[in-house]
């Protein structure tokens, strides 16, 4: 379970579900979304590894802000993060990661899995090892090169700079994602040129 009561549903023994505990040394609370970016990029890189091994197009793998991983328009992975804040700093962070690996059916969810994309089953232990490797890479950049993390995350955003449909406070709009701000809100530009940042409680993709 993550922030705002969000949960991940996965099939035991078929899908990869992992919790990674991080203990930042000097991360300020205002910069905590960098952790979410690092985790999303680690999962994106893991999925890209699998795609490359099967000669599939890695450009189909995108991040739907703040931290879902899509293949085309179908959800393949999600990340749930719970941070413990003490004063002005992040004391600890639990990063929950769920990846659809060997599942093939879901109820009420537009999803996909590595099995469906590659037409072959995947070894969960091997995937976990590679996930930790990629997480170690991006986590190692936090506080040292946050700009590189931000640039990679922005570049991987789903529908970036492309007009698509959203609902804003229940009202349908057409806008294009530009970036995310330090609070994890998606920055969009509406057709009329208005630029603003919104959180998930107000802004929803229409998939």
Identify the residue ranges that each predicted region occupies.
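Conserved RNA-binding domains used in RNP assembly and mRNA/RNA metabolism
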Residues: 160-207
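Detector for glycine-centered tight turns/loop "hinges" at secondary-structure junctions
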Residues: 2-5, 73, 119, 170, ...
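Polybasic "coupling" helices that flank or enter modular domains
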Residues: 131, 139-167
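A secondary-structure boundary/capping signal
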Residues: 65-66, 97, 199
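Short, acidic Gly/Pro/Ser/Thr-rich loop/turn segments
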Residues: 1, 25, 101-104, 185
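Conserved beta-strand residues within beta-sheet cores
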Residues: 66, 73-78, 150, 161-163, ...
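Short, acidic (Asp/Glu-rich) active-site segment that either coordinates a divalent metal cofactor
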Residues: 88-118
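Contiguous, small/hydrophobic- and glycine-enriched helical/loop subdomains that border
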Residues: 1-90, 121-133, 137-144
């Amino acid at each position: 379970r993550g922030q705002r009561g969000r949960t991940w549903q996965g099939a035991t023994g078929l899908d990869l579900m992992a919790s990674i505990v991080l203990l930042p040394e000097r991360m300020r609370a205002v910069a905590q979304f960098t952790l979410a970016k690092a985790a999303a990029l680690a999962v994106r890189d893991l999925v890209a590894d699998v795609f490359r091994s099967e000669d599939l197009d890695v450009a189909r793998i995108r991040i739907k802000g703040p931290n879902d991983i899509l293949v085309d328009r179908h959800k393949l992975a999600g990340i749930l993060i719970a941070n413990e804040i003490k004063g002005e700093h992040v004391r600890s962070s639990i990063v929950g990661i769920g990846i659809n690996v060997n599942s093939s059916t879901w109820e009420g969810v537009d999803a996909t899995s590595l099995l469906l994309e590659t037409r072959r089953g995947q070894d969960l232990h091997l995937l976990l090892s590679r996930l930790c490797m990629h997480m170690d890479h991006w986590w190692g950049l936090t506080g040292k090169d946050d700009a590189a993390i931000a640039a990679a995350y922005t570049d991987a955003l789903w529908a970036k700079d492309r007009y698509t449909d959203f609902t804003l406070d229940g009202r349908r709009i057409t806008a294009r994602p530009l970036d995310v701000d330090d609070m994890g809100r998606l920055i969009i530009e509406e057709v009329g040129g208005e630029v603003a940042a919104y959180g998930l409680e107000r802004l929803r993709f229409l998939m």
